[in-house]
Amino acid sequence: MGPQLATVSLLLLTFFSNSIQYPHSPAATECPAYFNGNIAGNACSREYSICVNGVRQAATCSDDSVFYEDECVPVDESPECRVDENTEEDDTPYAEFDCTSKQDGIYSIGCSNQFISCVAGGAYMAKCPDSLVFNERTQDCRESCDEVKQDTTTAPQVYEDGEEGYGEASGEIAGDYERQPSNEQPDSIDFDCNGLEDGNYADGCNDVFYSCSNNMVFQRYCPPGTVFNINQQSCDFQCTTDDPTTTVSYSTSTITTPQEDDSEYSSTTSADVISTTTTPSIDAIETTTTGFDAVTTTTTTQTPFVCQEGQVNSFGMCSSRFNRCQNNSVRSKQCPVNTLFESSLVMCVFDLPQCQPITVPAAPAYNSYGPPSDTIVSPFDENVRLKPKFDRRRKYHHGKPSYGPVNGNSYLENPFFIPRHRGGSHRDHRRYGYGPAIDSPFSTAFRGRAALSDQFKDYRRARMGKIQGDARKVDGNKRFLIDDEFEGPNAKFVESNIEQVFPKNRHSKKQLGPHEDPDGYDDEKTFDAKDLFGATRRKRSAYYGTEQSVYGQQSAQISARQAQVNKDCQQYTTPTFLTFGDCFDQFIFCSGNGINRMAACPIGETFDKTLRSCSETCGVSTTIVAVTIGTQTSDDLSAPSEYIENDGVTTQSTWNDQPSTTQAPNSYESYTTQYSSNDVPSTSAAPIGDRCSLDASGLFSLGCSQKYIQCSNGAAIVRRCGESLYFNEATQECTYRDEVPECGSQGSTSSPVITTPGQDQSSNYYGIPSDDVPSTTQTPVGDRCAYVASGLFDLGCSQKYIQCSDSAASVRECEGSLYFDERSQSCRFRDEVFKCQTADVSSSSTVPYLDFTTTPASPSEDEPTTYEPSVAPYIPSVTVNPVDTCTSLSDGTHGTGCSSFYFVCSHGRLISSGNCQLGEGYDPSVQGCRTFSEIPARACDEQEVTTDAGLVQLMPYKTLEEVLTTTEAATTVANDGPTDTYITGSTKYSTTDSGEYTIPYGDETTSTRSYDRADNDSEDEEEDDVEHDQKCTVGSRTPVGFCVRTYLECTDAGNVEKLCRIGKLFDSHSNRCVPRIGCGKEAIRDAIKDMIATTPAPAQPKQFEGRCAHVDGEAVFSIGVCSSKYLRCSYGASKLQQCSEDRVFSNDKLECIVRESVSACTVPKNPSIKKYYTSNDQSAFCDGKEDGLYRNERDCSAILQCFGGELFEHPSCQSSLAFNQLTGKCDYPQKVSGCENHGQTNGECSEHGSFIADANNCEVFYRCVWGRKVVMTCPSGTVFNPLLSVCDWPSAVPSCSGQASDSNSSYGSSTYNDDKSGY
């Protein structure tokens, strides 16, 4: 018991931080070459040395043990620590030495050969060998007390093995080992650990790596067939990524490397030039400063070299952390949530293809021998458990090589195999727990095992436990050990605690079938050792998907976000960054060769457009200097140089071994423009850093902006107000824009610098070139709305336009052949749009009201083409009172086509807008968000829909394009008035707007525009044309769209465009202007009737059918207590709506209010725990019970825990479940013995799955589950409807009209008042 206890203690003290270890002195005896075992230190001492493959590591015994012979034994059992009883205490040097207040260790009593060893508060005398004295400074025995040798960093002295071997893997030793010195020197190791931290380092992608410990180097080897992966710090079958990787340098000064010179320092001064040179290396750093008065000051300092500037080290393929060298120091960086670090691009990206989950098929394919198939041979096998087979692996030999003939499996030299037994006495005892203390990828805490990396997931790692199992049986979580126990005929098993080594989510849940071979091998075939590590390894049953390319799996499903990114990057053929605004944390990287990523900056950094990289000081005015672009060093990947063209600066990105450097302009102003008043202040103001240098602490505004500066002890931090709020420096708070003095007089200025494409072509934000826009570069949609107020803005001469609402942009399109006119804020004919007239007349490549005109530079032959944008002010044409988007729309939710954007209108005003979740779009037929595959095709064809549910087909109305298919109008102004002429077919036309006039016509206010054309030479032809083109009846009206204000009325002069008055829309069904709340109702009913007559009835009833049938007009109702959803009724139509975040609907106020103000939303943090036992019964219940969870005999759902003889109560299971103490989980009552009747009620269940109403409580009902009743409860405010077997409103169940318990769910009063509706 004593040796085993000492062994376990030694293991804990060696591998954990609370162990006491002393660095071995150079005078201590080193380990012989390739020797494995223990070497004792001083007499009666806890310190000793462990030799692993000739490498020495210091170790200590536990507090109450000392090292004697070959093991740690108690102090009392060590002969070296015994005290002579005949010795008088007064004469002993340690009699007066007090160890009670000292830590365990060795203490000197003077320059003598005796010293004191304090163990557990007791003093024990120990002696050095003859002619040696104890040296207090070195803590060992030496020839003199003043002898102190200097440490060296050379490899330790190695002794040659003796004549006698150390035995085989069984641990048996032929004889005692005697160390014999040898004059032969080992091979020198060509690796220097000076200045490196303790750890493992690789010298290329091979099987050799080096371990540094205390500036000492140790050469190590990986198993055959594997190489050392520096990123994973373990031996693997291949190297994933070349390391190190360099990325964009964060240096703020020009870095140069001086030539090595005989002189240690060099200084240069100049009276005319002010220069500063920084050299991050061990050599001298020279700084020269020259004043204006020709006074020269030279300061020379020396800074140690820590790392190469910009060097990046990753932590593996699918890791979110990485290290980056910045300012000659290594800094740890963390990627944001849902992003991983991609080493090849040196950035944090979303949707990394290499780390996407793989779908495992239901029936995995099995492979044994034969040609390659679609099943990948992978070392990370998750379903295989190897069957034990005697002598199927080759043995390892640690002694001298055998020169005789070898039959069967030959011996292999394994430098990382640790023998189970060591030399010396007590060889018949098994002792675990000794392992190498040096950090090694193959180190293990269990002696006598083959040390494998955690990445080999074939269940070979064992823990100590009771030996049990059968030689040929694989059952449960047992697995065999790879060690010398296979020397005998029976393989042994140990219980595994695999969940501590490999979490459950890293393993497949699939169970092996009854006829499947657990290891996937054919036992009748010969087994080769290379099958485990070599290329001839047979394929197993686990499926890993199709082969992976360099950048990811081809078969993995591309997410909707990645698909949108690929679409945005289609037009770019050179590396380009797409930003979402200035100092935003996310951006898009387009490589130009198909590798596109949605990326994000590390935590604490934002993307700086001026630097085209992530920065911690985005927005700080500073001088831009040389930027180093990351390189990719690869043996099999080489491509010509490519160029990143952004903001007028060309950056050369080379994919070869040599990095390139691009010199940016010398001033920050060349990258910046005058920002608009909404977001970012003008750069003419003081920089952020200078602002805080004047005022050490406080909050300062940046003009009329949502961002502001927080100065703290001279350091500047850029912060941002909440949504739609601006910072007011006078009140030191974020408030509305109209309350900020700085926003009162500022006007619109130019837009910021944007990312321009590589080719001189115009393109919109979505990456699709526009056919109707001149060749120029435009501002992206997102940036356009970030710097202007809400409203509608054109995209040049185009049918598409932008709708800005609270800095959110949505792209819309005019109907038919109409183009958007920003001046009138409406869709008109092409010849009536000012931008289109300018585009037709202008022959240059510039168009007014656009942001930039692209002018190609004239580079030399050796330089790439650079596009320098000329800054032009952006002046949006915004009317004083812009027309709201919802002016001509009915109340409710609206969307365009199958986009994910939707907005809510109420009384002709825009209430709110939003976007569906990723991968979903707005479906007008259900008035909600659905996946794109579930949206019907008809809904995608509609440009504008109503708020009523059930609209799944187009309305029967004529469009303007159908009315004017063969007639196009033009107007010429004569002396006395307009002259009506007509031109047929596709004759080119021009228009001149005639004067508008209003005619009172009942409820309509008419805005008339005549459609005329020029005169022809022949009056006969004109009359024929009039008779041919006149197809309308005088007095008839034609709708232009569905429920819009504009319509056409036929007159003698032709079709005249008219407008309904504000608040009314033209109804195509009644052919007149009606209130907007009732527009299209009859047409919708007719369409639904036609649809019902031609299509079968839906299988399921509408969710809110009949709930608004009793409501006349409009009303809102709550659907539950503390619910963020509520029901809006509008003329019998119901619609479920959602409050904004952190708000719930109040039935008293009939509006959404803050959740904290509702008392019903206050929920206790900890659920109440049933108290079944008093303090007197606690000891009685846990008497004789082991620690664990138990079921309460009084309540099957209660959970009790016994720990240390004390009773603890836990929250109970649900009322319908019972606690199963065998599984430790809540289970069905019929599976728990003694709880079969728990949760059941009286009554009979004739049919499984049927529902039974409760006779006494309308809110309670029962569900039949295999002959038993399960109690269920309806939500608050609803009762059970036995006719429909659903929870329904109380009004729908006559027998339960007044039994709803929730008073807040009453209908309340209607908010509709017809008298005050304004129609």
Curated annotation (Swiss-Prot):
One of its GO terms (biological process) is positive regulation of protein localization to cell cortex. The lineage of its organism: Eukaryota, Metazoa, Ecdysozoa, Nematoda, Chromadorea. Residues 28-83, 96-141, 190-236, 304-357, 566-614, 689-745, 782-838, 883-942, 1029-1081, 1105-1163, 1179-1237, 1242-1298 form the Chitin-binding type-2 domain. Residues 1-19 form the signal peptide. Residues 513-524 have a biased composition (Basic and acidic residues). Residues 250-271, 504-524, 649-682, 742-764, 984-1031, 1297-1319 are annotated as: Disordered. Disruption phenotype: RNAi-mediated knockdown causes the zygote to exit the spermatheca with a pinched morphology and to leave a trailing section behind. Zygotes have a fragmented chitin eggshell with an accumulation of chitin at one end of the embryo, causing polyspermy. In unfertilized oocytes, disrupts the homogenous distribution of cortical chitin synthase chs-1, pseudophosphatase egg-3 and kinase mbk-2 and causes the loss of egg-1 and egg-2 cell membrane localization resulting in their premature accumulation in cytoplasmic puncta. GO terms for cellular component: cell periphery; extracellular region. Its main location: secreted. Residues 1297-1312 have a biased composition (Low complexity). This is Chitin-binding domain protein cbd-1. InterPro entries: Chitin-bd_dom, Chitin-bd_dom_sf, Chitin_bind-dev_reg. It is found in: Secreted, Extracellular space, Extracellular matrix. PANTHER family: CHITIN BINDING PERITROPHIN-A, CHITIN-BINDING TYPE-2 DOMAIN-CONTAINING PROTEIN-RELATED. Residues 745-764, 984-995 have a biased composition (Polar residues). It comes from the Eukaryota. Glycans are attached at residues 327, 1016, 1304. Residues 1017-1027 have a biased composition (Acidic residues). It holds the Pfam family CBM_14. It comes from Caenorhabditis elegans. One of its GO terms (molecular function) is chitin binding. Disulfide bonds join 61-72, 128-141, 222-235, 335-348, 601-614, 721-734, 814-827, 916-929, 1060-1073, 1139-1152, 1213-1226, 1274-1287. Keywords: Chitin-binding, Developmental protein, Disulfide bond, Extracellular matrix, Glycoprotein, Repeat, Secreted, Signal. In unfertilized oocytes, maintains egg-1 and egg-2 at the plasma membrane together with chitin synthase chs-1 and kinase mbk-2. Essential for the formation of a continuous and cohesive chitin layer following fertilization.
